[in-house]
Amino acid sequence: MDQFLITGSSRIAGEVTISGAKNAALPLLAAMILAETPTTLHNVPSLQDVRTLIELIGGMGIKIQKQGDTVTCDTKSIDNFYAPYDLVKTMRASILVLGPLLARFGEAEVSLPGGCAIGSRPVDQHLKAFEAMGASITVENGYVIAQAPKGGKLLGCKFSFDMVTVGGTENVIMAAALAKGTTVLGNCALEPEVVDLANMLVAMGAKISGIGTAIMTIEGVERLHGCEYAVVPDRIETGSYLAGALMTGGDVLTKNTSALLLTPVLEKFEDMGAIITSGDDWIRAQMKGRPKAVDIRTQPHPGFPTDMQAQVMAIACLADGTSTFIENIFENRYMHVPELNRLGASIQVDGHTAVVKGVECFTAAPVMATDLRASMSLVMAAAAAEGESLIDRIYHIDRGYEHVEKKLRALGVNIERINSND
């Protein structure tokens, strides 16, 4: 199992090009199932989760061509509607093939998903919506078995999600695009990745209004065609590298990104003392001195994203003062706290609240990555620490950060990937 060896006391500075967003690429790849003609997707990040989903849809008989960051899918040869546990177990987003399969082919059998263990994150909202559209849903031996109503077409309906769910919103708008009649969805997620998916569906011939709002109306069409589309930049990768500048008194320029995707995070960075400048496709963070303490409350978009909570907490560990974090999205997303404390942080957790008392510096220690975003917070903390830190279970970071060592080295981080079996 690979590990990172990081020699700290780095000043994180330089330029880094941001990849396409993993959380956008996955639903866009799933949406390709809906198209009767080939679809080409650009700016696709080379990540384990992406490779897994490509393998998953390829196993259905879909012809896939990949060249660089471009993926083309032709669904003419699809011959099964099955998503096996062996692939689904590692990645939660695999449930997103359920809606497209059910909508286009009238049936699907998809294993219940895996992914980061940061909360229950149930798929019941997906299933309730499909049932409201007339589908028959059963769960047997860990598999969701779905069947469209008589005639093979889902039926448009009015449905409001009980809670804001990004995956649920994505799954249902894909299904509704080919449903018979009109679907009105309430309490939709507003995340940029949801907007990106809706825009691609429109490019494929879908009729969707209310994109980017809590109420979307989807008028079902008979068929969807392929298109050429580019994945939106990864706002979380952007924020993660900018966070490194704040932790180390650095200066980081992120390219191929957009400040419009990251407004609540950039505002907090400015509150912490950073100088933030931006243009159409770049953001720069400059930092001098210790960060200032802040209070963070995670919320669905357009609030502060839970996927940046761990990285900003790592900055707060070095802040002048006490910061308070309230995690409102997932009930188990403080697993990085014991690891940051091993590096010399002073954090106490009580339920959904974490109180962070700033310290002068981190000190090197062996730590263990617990989930995707926590792993990046530990990498940045280790880069700021004095001495050598060994980070275990870095397969988490490979799921969400493309070419991470190359990009970190370009920013001045002394990082080496080692195999613990060597």
UniProtKB/Swiss-Prot annotation:
2-(S-cysteinyl)pyruvic acid O-phosphothioketal sites (modified residues): C116
The EC number(s) this enzyme carries: 2.5.1.7
Residues of the active site: C116 (proton donor)
Keyword Transferase assigned: yes
Keywords: Cell cycle, Cell division, Cell shape, Cell wall biogenesis/degradation, Cytoplasm, Peptidoglycan synthesis, Pyruvate, Transferase
Major enzyme class: transferase
Pfam families tied to this protein: EPSP_synthase
GO terms under biological process: cell division; cell wall organization; peptidoglycan biosynthetic process; regulation of cell shape; UDP-N-acetylgalactosamine biosynthetic process
GO cellular component term of the entry, any: cytoplasm
Catalytic activity line of the entry: phosphoenolpyruvate + UDP-N-acetyl-alpha-D-glucosamine = UDP-N-acetyl-3-O-(1-carboxyvinyl)-alpha-D-glucosamine + phosphate
Family to which the UniProt record says this protein belongs: Belongs to the EPSP synthase family. MurA subfamily.
The protein's name: UDP-N-acetylglucosamine 1-carboxyvinyltransferase
